[in-house]
């Protein structure tokens, strides 16, 4: 096992638009190598060229000193290069073993009858070697995302993968699942397996990786060994400038209570939740995965109305039974799943921006092309959206630009309360700072922001107060001076 890969001067254009220009990447046997860059820098495209999904326009790929190009991903996989995408390729209604043997099923001769017992036993043994003890006959839908990720790695190893490419591998994992993943990576690197680690999570990269290659605007910027670089240097290389402090300075002018929930309860999700948000405030919401944070936000927005309890806006009790009720109260909700809930991927930027703003963009009862065009231009400029025009389909945008479109479409209703659920997940460092600046602008105008985040540095860096949820109840509320990673985790896990 073991493989040395060298990619040099790789170029690629789509419809005449250059995506990669003289990109380079090299990985050694048993190395965990981060591939970093802002969204749209060309990281995934470069790896798709390596694995035969896209054909390069120029440059060379050498594997163990021999020039090599794959016709498709299957050919690359057979050669020993596996790509585990952010959206895992696990079929929930199949068993663990069926997922692992998909396309490679063991059969009794040519009868078409599966060797189910043998496949279950092999699957269990493979997973046990990676520290995951589950039955091969168990349905994949019963497993957590972290466990499904280990199954993807086991699938890759069953095809004798020497190089495993992982795209944003920890985006949906709990802290404990991340630890498990890192244990598996460390075990396999000692056996000569190499990992390409595509991520924006700097702390993880400095914890698990040996080296970093940085791309910017499709070009190779440089390679650094982890012990010889710093967070600031990597960020500067990624964005082509120093972005200064990670979190922009906040000048909080906190005013009257704008929103209050009293004893909010949703059966089976959360109970007796009470808290307030004030004008000009960013309220961070922390808690372990499954604690009920998103469920509370969905209740505020009317997706899943409260079974009991009260909601007050500016001191007046209101009933929110649907998103329309929430929008009338100028409440906006940006969900954590932007692709399935926040955007219509086949629509253009302009069409997505118009969706919650049809009333404001109409003259009489007719949608005004002029108003729609102006609104699109204004929002793209305000949020620094990188796109060819407002007619570009949102599915072709980078993750950071997609997130900006989700935020922009809700800014059109001039929200007095903006709820952001995991606002910077899968977003690069430069785009993160722009999103933080938007949050600050809103609060400086006297509006309020609720930010749900699993990244504690983000919660601490941006929040005026932190609401901690534990098993569907309020674990505690911490002021800026009291909040620390330790105090938040103590409340999130049921401590004092």
UniProtKB/Swiss-Prot annotation:
Keywords per UniProt: ATP-binding, Cell membrane, Membrane, Nucleotide-binding, Repeat, Sugar transport, Translocase, Transport
Disulfide-bonded cysteines: none
Subcellular location(s) of the protein: Cell membrane
SMART domains linked: AAA (SM00382)
EC numbers for this chain: 7.5.2.7
Residues covered by the ABC transporter domain: 5-242, 252-496
Primary subcellular site in the record, as a coarse category: membrane
Keyword Chaperone on entry: no
Record's catalysed reaction(s): D-ribose(out) + ATP + H2O = D-ribose(in) + ADP + phosphate + H(+)
Described function: Part of the ABC transporter complex RbsABC involved in ribose import. Responsible for energy coupling to the transport system.
Protein name stated in the entry: Ribose import ATP-binding protein RbsA
Organism: Bacillus cereus (strain ATCC 14579 / DSM 31 / CCUG 7414 / JCM 2152 / NBRC 15305 / NCIMB 9373 / NCTC 2599 / NRRL B-3711)
Lineage: Bacteria, Bacillati, Bacillota, Bacilli, Bacillales
